[in-house]
């Protein structure tokens, strides 16, 4: 449902773009929503180039200052890294909703100044957790007890510790974006 919602946002808002950043270990799409002002989208490739240049250790301090004045801040927000911590993915939905539906001065300033990358960090674990919880038809019979099996195909709950090795497809997908 999160993926369908993000797709819809990407289709209907001039402030959002939905993209698939790769496949997960179990073959699901891992998606990202890019959120910024409509004006920033006109120069998005330029801002990407500036960000890549700023990430280069060979530039001088003066070049870095000049580039930072020309670019936009990039903010990464992921959710759902640990599948049993379900609020993580839900905050992405709420944050996207707030940024895309509000037209107050503060929201407009954020969207003008920042490019926000919002990613579901663990679609496989989320699907497993959801199926486990919803296995009982009657809500009163549903259990919040932990899953009786290892989740996150190769790393278990420790998928956040994979960011230095990048063994998992999910970590690799995220690494390519950063």
For the regions a language model picked out, list residue spans one by one.
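N-terminal low-complexity, intrinsically disordered segments
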Residues: 29-31, 40-51
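Active-site/substrate-binding loop(s) of hydrolase catalytic cores
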Residues: 36, 47-81, 86-178
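A non-catalytic alpha/beta surface segment that caps or lines the substrate-entry region
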Residues: 2-39
């Amino acid at each position: 449902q999160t993926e369908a919602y993000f797709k819809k946002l990407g289709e209907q808002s001039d402030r959002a773009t939905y993209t698939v950043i790769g496949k997960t270990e179990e073959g699901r799409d891992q998606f990202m929503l890019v959120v910024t002002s409509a004006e920033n989208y006109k120069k998005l490739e330029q801002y990407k180039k500036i960000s890549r240049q700023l990430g280069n250790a060979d530039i001088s301090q003066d070049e870095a200052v000049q580039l930072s004045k020309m670019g936009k801040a990039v903010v990464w927000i992921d959710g759902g890294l640990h599948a049993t911590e379900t609020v993580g993915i839900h905050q992405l939905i709420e944050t996207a909703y707030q940024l895309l539906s509000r037209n107050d001065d503060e929201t407009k300033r954020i969207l003008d100044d920042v490019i926000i990358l919002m990613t579901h960090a663990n679609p496989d674990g989320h699907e497993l957790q959801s199926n486990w919880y919803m296995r009982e038809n009657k809500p009163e019979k549903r259990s919040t007890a932990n899953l009786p099996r290892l989740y996150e195909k190769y790393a278990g709950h420790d998928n956040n510790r994979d960011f230095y090795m990048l063994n998992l497809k999910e970590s690799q997908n995220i690494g390519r974006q950063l």
